[in-house]
Amino acid sequence: MQAMLKQTFDPLQKTSYTVLSVTGLSGGPGELPIFRDLALQLPAGVSALLGDEGVGKTSLMRLLSGDLVATSGQLRLASRVAPLSLPQPSAVFWIDLRLPLHDSDTPAHCWAQLRSSLPAWSDATQNELIEALQLAPHLDKRLNMLSTGSRRKVGLVAALASGATVTLLDQPFVSLDQPSIRSLQAFLAQWGQNTERAWLIADYEKPAHLPLVSVLQL
């Protein structure tokens, strides 16, 4: 079954700078592509990718980031055109927020590994998020010792400190405590005013208290 994508834009953001545009995207996690000849645009600011369980939200994010290799497609990022295959993580960043490959790592070790391929990594953002998400007591613990929520916070710090031109966040509010949810909403609302970067949030419903420049519905 192939997925269909519908995109709507905030009419007040008509002149918003297009950070990422994709045409002719085909691919999926199996032999049969769930996306065929897909097109989308991400304006500067925060957008949402909505859909039920199993419709392809994560697969689409993996295709956009190159974590899953597309069978065809073209990506235009900040006016640079390239085939849709393995974009640099510093350009389009996605990570599984559960961090399944980092069980034995501490948060600091995990971030150090990731930042080696992220030249725009922000130490200031990392430190702000450690405080805002209340991660300081857990920095010396291995990830397999952390709760689901704390572990996902480590992934969120990596994604948001990455400095990527386009940051893809797969259900970022799952398993977070309410103070952390409010802190994350505030950070995204602030960063969403950036005129040259884009954030895409995948979830079942529109994120609360966040102005969105566009909504993509699967």
Question: At which residue positions do the language-model features occur?
Answer:
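ABC-family nucleotide-binding domains
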Residues: 170, 176-177, 181
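Conserved ABC ATPase "signature" region
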Residues: 123-138
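Conserved ABC ATPase signature
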Residues: 142-151
